[in-house]
């Protein structure tokens, strides 16, 4: 039996395992991949990427994994284009993410 657990994020999008998402932290945001969903707590485990340059993201040498409340996920279905040699890729919608983060920040931070 396969159990699909999902939650809705800030925009109302459903969040699933393996989704690439943007997460609000303090006065900035980070891009990462949902690794695990803790259905009983509205929390997800996310493996974060590092910002390399102008919209490019890659996986850090040392894994950066954290458990995050779904309320901090403000953008889901982030599309990574053209994965590089270290994985990751270019975030095609970086301007949209930044704009929505500003709105999120004004509403919640």
Task: Map each language-model feature to its residues.
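Mixed-charge, Lys/Arg-rich low-complexity intrinsically disordered regions
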Residues: 1-17
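Short beta-strand-centered aromatic/proline hotspots
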Residues: 28-38
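Intrinsic-disorder/low-complexity loop/linker signature
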Residues: 12, 27, 54-55
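Epigenetic mark-reader domains in eukaryotic nuclear proteins
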Residues: 43-109
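Long, low-complexity acidic tracts
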Residues: 1, 40-42
């Amino acid at each position: 039996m396969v159990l699909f657990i999902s939650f809705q994020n800030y925009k109302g999008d459903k969040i699933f395992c393996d989704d690439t998402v943007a997460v609000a932290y303090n006065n900035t945001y980070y891009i990462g991949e949902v690794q695990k969903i803790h259905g009983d707590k509205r929390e997800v485990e996310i493996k974060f990427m590092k910002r390399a340059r102008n919209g490019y993201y890659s996986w850090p040498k040392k894994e950066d994994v954290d458990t995050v409340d779904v309320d901090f996920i403000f953008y889901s279905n982030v599309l990574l284009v053209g994965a590089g040699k270290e994985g990751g890729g270019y975030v095609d919608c970086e301007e949209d993410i930044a704009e929505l983060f500003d709105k999120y920040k004004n509403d919640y931070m």
